[in-house]
Amino acid sequence: MRRHAIILAAGKGTRMKSKKYKVLHEVAGKPMVEHVLESVKGSGVDQVVTIVGHGAESVKGHLGERSLYSFQEKQLGTAHAVQMAKSHLEDKEGTTIVVCGDTPLITKETLETLIAHHEDANAQATVLSASIQQPYGYGRIVRNASGRLERIVEEKDATQAEKDINEISSGIFAFNNKTLFEKLTQVKNDNAQGEYYLPDVLSLILNDGGIVEVYRTNDVEEIMGVNDRVMLSQAEKAMQRRTNHYHMLNGVTIIDPDSTFIGPDVTIGSDTVIEPGVRINGRTEIGEDVVIGQYSEINNSTIENGACIQQSVVNDASVGANTKVGPFAQLRPGAQLGADVKVGNFVEIKKADLKDGAKVSHLSYIGDAVIGERTNIGCGTITVNYDGENKFKTIVGKDSFVGCNVNLVAPVTIGDDVLVAAGSTITDDVPNDSLAVARARQTTKEGYRK
């Protein structure tokens, strides 16, 4: 059976008090609507239509060709929004799920189960519900004497008795697609809001003797919508807790989960230890037996087995096995560290390849460079790579020793087994097995201070 999805993402989100389009506010480093799209796609849906309005181009820019789009110029209610997908879906067979773009915690597993329940019951519609202690603001599930759904009533249209009901509609539905678009044309806006409500489609189906199911989830967090910054922080916390829980169950030690942020696309090997205050974002891959020291930040990087990152920032870089970084080092985009490398305190590496066993231990900048195997770069060494217009490359061979406070003025090549004397400014290439000294000779005037 064909399966389709409609993501409702046209709301302005005025309660966010933001210039940014509501569904583009991020949870765990990713726009809310992108979380929803990934869960929808993961549930086995063949085609997705996202309903956009204010800020449409921004949403399209994030989701790209993973979705089709329909534009809702005026926000006249959820039924009106769904009807905007008519040109894409009206004649399709199969099941269509409707999901709100501001529910970033919904999982593909719950959507899969909702669809399966709906199709197994041969229902025309199924609503995902949950029971919560404080149902204010949600539509209530009103059941008849036999426990079947009678209707869904919105908060502003509910009687006091209905407001006392704690089973709520999540705003997530599964429909027989053709039934959905047939009934949408019959929805009226005679309610307190003057809007066209999608739950009214369920009442129309019931009035015609159709089957409407309720599938209740026990995970209330999943259906939480985000309407303001407080709810955004709650969703962030819930996503953080879920992600950390997953990694801990898979063999990762997280010393303080409450202060540790790990993005949803991060992979971490077993027996790795994450210390407090760490942030790991993007498509980062961390191997086994790694230690990520407190307050480190890692983005879109690869950290291989046995490496140790201490209080450092790593962006778009790779760190080899058993390599030590930090404390207080910065690996910028293009930094590639081999195995058994040491990058020490207050060292900055940018677009540089440090081969196995290389050491840059203190107070150095290495940019646009290649440092050979087992070469030692002394404290305060700088690759002078920029002339104000262009960047130039520095190459240092293997088994070389660069003394403290050396300037390597690129473009320049230092050979293998070279010794560069401390305090030198190197402007010319140095061949293998050489000593390079480029500094003024010391002059001492004895008795000068007497």
UniProtKB/Swiss-Prot annotation:
Binding site for acetyl-CoA: 385-386, 422, 439
Top EC class for this record: transferase
Role played: Catalyzes the last two sequential reactions in the de novo biosynthetic pathway for UDP-N-acetylglucosamine (UDP-GlcNAc). The C-terminal domain catalyzes the transfer of acetyl group from acetyl coenzyme A to glucosamine-1-phosphate (GlcN-1-P) to produce N-acetylglucosamine-1-phosphate (GlcNAc-1-P), which is converted into UDP-GlcNAc by the transfer of uridine 5-monophosphate (from uridine 5-triphosphate), a reaction catalyzed by the N-terminal domain.
Cofactor binding note: Binds 1 Mg(2+) ion per subunit.
Protein source organism: Staphylococcus aureus (strain N315)
Name of the protein this chain belongs to: Bifunctional protein GlmU
Pyrophosphorylase as annotated region, ranges: 1-229
Region (Linker): 230-250
Cofactor names: Mg(2+)
Name of encoding gene: glmU
Pfam families from the UniProt entry: Hexapep (PF00132), NTP_transferase (PF00483)
